[in-house]
């Protein structure tokens, strides 16, 4: 089984990696947005500890990028990276994304009806649920997600 490993640390690395990873899946255009959102969530919420409430405020004030750049320089965050593993099994393509944060309550966000339409945050995981993955699972801590698609 071929296994490929990657790391990302900055937002500008995420799009290119999501495009590259998606090419290994049967329907790249469908899974690419899900991969992108998972990588972005791992970086901003996991590694940089930007909570949902703060993200909403930063987006409304057009200061999200500024805050991400500021946190990337802070001692407690500057050495963090997101680990990505792509496994090409005989019958499935699988991606495993792990951040170095404290994790989150993924059950809340993956349960239909727990998100309201007027919220600016939580949309990424909602998109992931509809991104063409056959299976999505999180570790107990909530800092690792595994998504797979049958070949």
Model regions: which residues?
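Glycine-rich/acidic phosphate-handling loop/turn and adjacent ATP-lid/helix
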Residues: 53-122
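Residue-level signal for the start and early helices of compact helical domains
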Residues: 22, 39, 73, 95, ...
